[in-house]
Amino acid sequence: MHIKSIILEGFKSYAQRTEVNGFDPLFNAITGLNGSGKSNILDSICFLLGISNLSQVRASNLQDLVYKNGQAGITKASVSITFDNSDKKQSPLGFEVHDEITVTRQVVIGGRNKYLINGVNANNTRVQDLFCSVGLNVNNPHFLIMQGRITKVLNMKPPEILSMIEEAAGTRMYEYKKIAAQKTIEKKEAKLKEIKTILEEEITPTIQKLKEERSSYLEYQKVMREIEHLSRLYIAYQFLLAEDTKVRSAEELKEMQDKVIKLQEELSENDKKIKALNHEIEELEKRKDKETGGILRSLEDALAEAQRVNTKSQSAFDLKKKNLACEESKRKELEKNMVEDSKTLAAKEKEVKKITDGLHALQEASNKDAEALAAAQQHFNAVSAGLSSNEDGAEATLAGQMMACKNDISKAQTEAKQAQMKLKHAQQELKNKQAEVKKMDSGYRKDQEALEAVKRLKEKLEAEMKKLNYEENKEESLLEKRRQLSRDIGRLKETYEALLARFPNLRFAYKDPEKNWNRNCVKGLVASLISVKDTSATTALELVAGERLYNVVVDTEVTGKKLLERGELKRRYTIIPLNKISARCIAPETLRVAQNLVGPDNVHVALSLVEYKPELQKAMEFVFGTTFVCDNMDNAKKVAFDKRIMTRTVTLGGDVFDPHGTLSGGARSQAASILTKFQELKDVQDELRIKENELRALEEELAGLKNTAEKYRQLKQQWEMKTEEADLLQTKLQQSSYHKQQEELDALKKTIEESEETLKNTKEIQRKAEEKYEVLENKMKNAEAERERELKDAQKKLDCAKTKADASSKKMKEKQQEVEAITLELEELKREHTSYKQQLEAVNEAIKSYESQIEVMAAEVAKNKESVNKAQEEVTKQKEVITAQDTVIKAKYAEVAKHKEQNNDSQLKIKELDHNISKHKREAEDGAAKVSKMLKDYDWINAERHLFGQPNSAYDFKTNNPKEAGQRLQKLQEMKEKLGRNVNMRAMNVLTEAEERYNDLMKKKRIVENDKSKILTTIEDLDQKKNQALNIAWQKVNKDFGSIFSTLLPGANAMLAPPEGQTVLDGLEFKVALGNTWKENLTELSGGQRSLVALSLILSMLLFKPAPIYILDEVDAALDLSHTQNIGQMLRTHFTHSQFIVVSLKEGMFNNANVLFKTKFVDGVSTVARFTQCQNGKISKEAKSKAKPPKGAHVEV
């Protein structure tokens, strides 16, 4: 791409429209007197290219570029340059279709700057992209050498010369970005220090302080809760003591008064007894001789009656047992019959299914035969109407069928001719192409072999990846799962601690009493070792266990002793050693009696309502084995007070019935059940253990997956590289001429095969159509006979179809009857099976009834036997009484003496009780006053009075010793006052905020550190590439530098070398040789020689990265004529592919140019004249002889 013409209008000294045409594609020169406007042409080119530093075009702002700053009536400056774009290799991106590109830039005073490309408005960026794509970046212009550039190069130090090489090699931009990146790293480093300082000096101490304050706050809350709990407990205890004193004093007062009355009654009773005894003694004396044994006879009669009743009940009992055995035998027979019927029923169902399937098959066959009959009837009707059947079964006339055959023959012949022509053409083309493609291109073969090798390597990599058995994204999913598990574990721990904080009694912790302590020896609290089968029984089970729920189960008494002595237990615990505990359990006989009494579903042993490990059997029997649990109060009362049971019983609602004299009940506390909370705690603990095990397993899996993941990533990266390489090779093969020829050959071969197949098919179609036509033609000749034959065939087919349809219909109806019969049999079997079930249920009910009756009768038989035994004993006793009557009379005298002595004792006791009655009256009055005062001071006593002293309640005085609670309360009040002075109530919320800020800063810190690591790695990698590119650039520039300098100064040589003791990367300096003598520095050279050195370096760098256009502005100003002449020759010889526009005042320079432009300043405006020069530098005669050169030679305005 090169400049063809420039149009200037209102630009600097070019007031009028000035066209500068006919630029030479290679060497152009501009000359003229100072101030004539020759440099303004260069300024116009820079202006159009979009220069941003206006000082380089000798202007301070865009208004300075307008002719006389717009004060001469011209308010617009416009520059338009036409570029030759016929060489498409150097064409800008996107402009390959244009042979010429015209770019215009306009600036209007007080208006805006405007660009046009080929007459169309364009923005600054698009113009910059256009010129930058061909190496014409005017804001970094290596193609532009202005006045003073040579002096600047001569004064450069080694690092500055190196920077020019870097600029030429394109690595300078990297250095700028590297410095920017290093500054970014320094900023990030400062940010890291800031984050670290904030973490160390602010957040971490704050978090530590807040954690301590949180601990204090939690301790303060714990103390407050305990004070509240213990205060109520202690006050409740004091209230109970006062109330107990009041009640006890009143009860004891009443009891003593009753005792006085009782003693007085006993005195009176004893007097009566003494009189009665005296009377009995008299009677006994009288009856001693009269009694002859009448009582004995009555007792013997009673014995006989008891024996008769016993025999009768025993007979009835034996009869019921026989009936039960009979029913059980009947049940076995029914069960046997049911099993046999089930087998028969299953066999019959299979048979029904089989016959039903056969019926379906017959129905399908019957339907098909019916359809065939309809088709035969239709065919008969068509033949009767004079129609005939074609090959498709459709009815048509013979003439119509013959016409269709003719069409088929004609179509087949046409297709055959087309296929023959296509085949002939393809065969000829194939022959020609095969002659052209005789051997495979060696480059194609190499690429094909390379592609195969890459594919094999890909397959090998895929096999290795598959062998690793690694799933992509598995590591990320595992990491996400680990984060989720960590969050779940944290949540569960918080829930666990919250439950323990809410219910401190659930916490059981101890210190190992000795080294290598086996924690399996301590089983834990009873409440933690059980699971309640039915949650509705929790209240009852809590009352059954009472304070034993908090007992600690251990394996041996030795373990318990060590735990108590050195376990540092936080509170008092009762120990249950499994090897020593003496457990009792309700006998199975007692349980059966209770179940018979109220029903088996209404009473249970408490032990049966909980689940536990077998090794804890003794401990659980100790806690739950001696109490019944009933569903309601009525059943509980029956069970507890039955003389055969007499066992403590608890209802599901919480009422307790104790046959030894205790009955408790009423409203229960609405607080959460301890066992329910224990179960909730266990569930949380189990889930926490599962999550921790999962996390541990996940950590192990991640550790094992790390190496595999890394190896997989490496193999995947190699595989992707090979895939890209294979795609490139495949594309290259497909774009090669050999591949295209092969594709054409394959297409021709395919065409030949298709044509041959078409020919074969058309011949077959034509043959069949001709044969059919011949048959139809014969039919037409014998139409009447043919019609008769077809009519007979149709009648025959119709009769055959009708016979077949009737037969299949008959078979289907027979099969339907068979199915209906066997279905009825199946239904009968099902009814019999149902009947057996009902009979079996009735037998089971009878057996159950007999068993219940036998159980009752067994009890009655036992009772009758006991009556017989008692009657026998009475008879025996009576016989003994008669023998011992003398002894009784003596005993009566002794009893009279005893009663008299008791009267004396009672009189003494009455005097003592009178004294105590006075004392208890005073105590009862004091207790009543204290109770009244406490009820007035504490409103909550009335609401919670029913819970005072109740087991498993907040006022359980057995579990919590009130005296110890009072002492503990005093200490807690002191702790509360101490903690209250320093506690921070906002510590919890502030700590959460501080921890979030800490985590956020740590995340930012990790991001910054990762960014820094990546940047440093990239810089290190790019530094190596930069050094390689710099060495290549230095060698190329150095070679051209020496060559150009030798051309400019024959017999001399020059090079760029690093300073002594340094490398190329440290800097470069000039080394010049005149003849065979190398100069130490440039000061030994003349001014002109130094200028040539600098110019040679500039031009050698232009050669390293050639641009389509070069602009030189009086670079020969400091040179003499001989050197100037050499520069011109050098440009002609070294730069044969670029356009040069040179401004010079010396003939030695512009005489070498192919086209010369001369500027003049006429009437305040600049003009331009064009001259074509011969190779010897002389102006053509034609151009000299005319004032105005012909068109194409020069233009003057």
Swiss-Prot record:
By its UniProt entry, which InterPro entries does this protein fall under?
Answer: P-loop_NTPase (IPR027417), RecF/RecN/SMC_N (IPR003395), SMC (IPR024704), Smc2_ABC (IPR027120), SMC_hinge (IPR010935), SMC_hinge_sf (IPR036277)
Q: Which GO terms describe its cellular component?
A: chromatin; condensed chromosome; condensed nuclear chromosome; condensin complex; cytoplasm; cytosol; extracellular exosome; nuclear chromosome
Query: Where on the tree of life does the source sit, at the highest rank?
Result: Eukaryota
Domain SMC hinge spans what residues? 522-640
Glycoprotein keyword on record: no
What keywords are assigned to this protein? Acetylation, ATP-binding, Cell cycle, Cell division, Chromosome, Coiled coil, Cytoplasm, DNA condensation, Mitosis, Nucleotide-binding, Nucleus
One GO molecular-function annotation for this sequence? ATP hydrolysis activity
Record's SUPFAM superfamilies? P-loop containing nucleoside triphosphate hydrolases (SSF52540), Smc hinge domain (SSF75553)
The record's principal subcellular location, in a coarse class, is nucleus
Ranges in a coiled coil: 173-507, 672-926, 963-1031
Q: Quick check: keyword Cell division in the entry?
A: yes
- N6-acetyllysine is found on K114, K222, K677, K1158, K1160
User: Where's it found, cell-wise?
Assistant: Nucleus; Cytoplasm; Chromosome
- Entry-linked SMART domains: SMC_hinge
The record's Gene Ontology biological-process terms are:
cell division; kinetochore organization; meiotic chromosome condensation; meiotic chromosome segregation; mitotic chromosome condensation; positive regulation of chromosome condensation; positive regulation of chromosome segregation; positive regulation of chromosome separation
**What positions does the entry give for ATP binding?**
G32, L33, N34, G35, S36, G37, K38, S39
Please give the Pfam families that the UniProt record associates with this protein.
SMC_hinge, SMC_N
What's this chain's function? Answer: Central component of the condensin complex, a complex required for conversion of interphase chromatin into mitotic-like condense chromosomes. The condensin complex probably introduces positive supercoils into relaxed DNA in the presence of type I topoisomerases and converts nicked DNA into positive knotted forms in the presence of type II topoisomerases.
Q: How does it assemble?
A: Forms a heterodimer with SMC4. Component of the condensin complex, which contains the SMC2 and SMC4 heterodimer, and three non SMC subunits that probably regulate the complex: BRRN1/CAPH, CNAP1/CAPD2 and CAPG. Interacts with BRD4 (isoform B), leading to insulate chromatin from DNA damage response pathway.
Domain-level remarks:
The SMC hinge domain, which separates the large intramolecular coiled coil regions, allows the heterodimerization with SMC4, forming a V-shaped heterodimer.
Q: What family does the Swiss-Prot or TrEMBL record give for this protein?
A: Belongs to the SMC family. SMC2 subfamily.
**What protein am I looking at?**
Structural maintenance of chromosomes protein 2
The record lists the organism as Homo sapiens
